[in-house]
Amino acid sequence: MLISQLKKFDAYPKTVDDFRVKTYTGAIVSIIGGVFILWLFFSQVTLYFSTDIHHELFVDTTRGEKLKINMDITFHHLPCAYLSLDAMDVSGEHQFDVAHNIFKKRLSPTGQPIIEAPPIREEEINKKESVKDNNDVVGCGSCYGAEDPSKGIGCCNTCEEVRVAYSKKGWGLDPSGIPQCIREGFTKNLVEQNGEGCQVYGFILVNKVAGNFHFAPGKSFQQHHMHVHDLQPFKDGSFNVSHTINRLSFGNDFPGIKNPLDDVTKTEMVGVGMFQYFVKVVPTIYEGLNGNRIATNQYSVTEHYRLLAKKGEEPSGLPGLFFMYDLSPIMMKVSERGKSFASFLTNVCAIIGGVFTVFGIFDSFIYYSTKNLQKKIDLGKTF
């Protein structure tokens, strides 16, 4: 009795097979509907295994962290012996002639590496310049008027020590007239590398505040609270700052990151100038599907070129490549999110039911339209 009453709840009543009519158009519509269902199903499978990227913005509350700046820049017409990398920020911290974690590779005028040996670490170059032929020097070498016992400058046995003593006095150094520099081959290196290019790569660590770093010819020092580059050794004054930024990033990379300055090439044609890039750094946290978090940065950039002198003229400023960066107070969180299986199952059921219903209506429309048309044709033949 209970089982017979249960039949009343059947939402899918069945018809007798004898009352079912199968047609060619119905078969075609069914095949098309099946193909459509399969296409939508595989689309949902692809979508299920893909990830969505969500962005959130909030105030950056981090303090006291360091900012890592990764760089790989090729100077097509500036020798490695000419280049100096300096960094400074609004907190007053200065890094002169940065050498730690910076490498330089000499390039031929055609852009090919000149030597096959491993690239020379910049701090090793400076160390080598400081101690080269030190054993050959007896006693206390002259600083040529730049001695200052109050600052601990009494003897200058190397070219680097003479340069430091001169920079303390605010004097320019002509290495061609300094025996220490002649002995170490400083001027000879400048002459030998003339016409070459240089690839500079590595990274620097700076305070997480606004600042700038730049590549410019000559050794740098501070005089009367001003940042100065000694261009005395480069008497011709012809500095071509044409360059290619192979890579420039602030922090670690994450999937999908786009650095707007990567593979950017600038060519100097009319004279000596200053390339300036104004960078807005946005602190970013990337969170993957596995929960791993990467604290890094993204950035946007605007650029400006300032012509300092036409060819053959004296530059009215310091030629070079300058990056002025500022940090946004807003932090961005980039999160990967996957699809839930329940959502996938719901979409698949909706696809199958929806396509089956729509194509069923379409098949019924074709069947009854054809049947009515056939009746009218038969009725016309009768009369």
Swiss-Prot record:
Residues 1-26, 369-383 are cytoplasmic. It is found in: Endoplasmic reticulum-Golgi intermediate compartment membrane; Golgi apparatus, cis-Golgi network membrane; Endoplasmic reticulum membrane. It comes from the Eukaryota. One of its GO terms (cellular component) is COPII-coated ER to Golgi transport vesicle. InterPro entries: Erv, Erv_C, Erv_N. This is Probable endoplasmic reticulum-Golgi intermediate compartment protein 3. It comes from Dictyostelium discoideum. GO terms for biological process: intracellular transport; vesicle-mediated transport.
